[in-house]
Amino acid sequence: MKSALPKVLHRLAGKSLLQHVLDAAAGLGPAHTVVITGHGAAEVEAASAASGAVFVRQMPQLGTGHAVQQAVPALSKTHAVTLVLNGDVPLITTTTAAALVQSCSGDKLALLTVELPDATGYGRIVRGAGGGVQAIVEHKDATPALRAIREVYTGILAAPTALLARWVMALNNNNVQGEFYLTDVVAMAVADGVPVVAIAAPSDTEVLGVNSPVQLADLERRFQRQQAEALLEAGVRLADPARLDVRGRLHCGSDV
């Protein structure tokens, strides 16, 4: 981000990226929320203290699977499902998250996927002859044939807590990056005979991450366009929707 500010504290529509995610999660009424911090941990924890989340630190950062490993002690085995979200994917909605959680009922692993014209950097969804999900292969580990796949993993999943805890604690780092990949739990689920379901995101806007000022600006515009369209559909007259910036929640009467 070319900034001293931790990435998840950069703002979109006047609210930090992380707060957008926490608000979406709060809409599900979770038993509790665990936030895994790394770079700028103290600053992130201070900024989000009012959320009531439990904070655990990932030191050092050894991959997405390693991150979830740090949260395992804070996950009560009485919690039927664990939903994994990303602090830099701010526009995920409560509705989509709820659908994903519902999809993993009956001891399934549920993945949120999307098809992208340019899938660079994303893990590819590998399906078997019958169409079922068999694995996720990270971009850096993918062959040219696998990189041609456009269906990708968004980084968001839901799974029965006991199964997820067992899988992540069994991860290894035998890969190009020498990291513990959360995506490896898919192959573990398949090996255990646990069904893996892939739920398509309603739009790529919900699942795009922020890794640069350019991407942040793009999501800001997408978000504001969504707000403008919602207001127009509610009957609000906007002379130029492209020049609207909404902060917080806006309630309008008729003939505004």
Q: Where are the model-predicted features located?
A:
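Conserved beta-strand segments of alpha/beta enzyme cores
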Residues: V8, V54, G132, P195-V197, ...
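Structural beta-sheet core signal
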Residues: V34-V35, L83-V84, L109-L112, A198
